């Protein structure tokens, strides 16, 4: 679900429905409930799958992966948009989030995914 929330927020930014705001982004993806290393790995996997771009990763202290770029530098790609709009499981997640979370629901309605 984290990937969906990230893609949804970045899509709303791309469509200029919203401007990137770190506090709003953190709340939208519920960053306070996600481990930092886990989130970085999600970003890495999303970039490897070409769903997002703009993430810069550096290995520090051995094998610890850190995000060297700002989250506001992340951008959704064409593949990310297609993933949001065509992936059946993601639509189901969108419907679930629409029913349960106000902020994410507002973003879903704003970009017209459900």
Predicted regions mapped to residue ranges:
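Generic structural signal for hydrophobic core residues of well-folded globular domains
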Residues: 10-14, 46, 84-87
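Short acidic, hydrophobic short linear motifs in intrinsically disordered regions
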Residues: 16-33
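Short alpha-helical segments that sit at the start of domains
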Residues: 1-13
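Short, amphipathic alpha-helical interaction segments positioned at domain boundaries
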Residues: 61-100
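Short amphipathic alpha-helical interaction segments
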Residues: 32-59, 70-71
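Short acidic DE-rich linear segments
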Residues: 107-114
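Short, solvent-exposed secondary-structure capping/transition elements
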Residues: 18-19, 55, 92-94
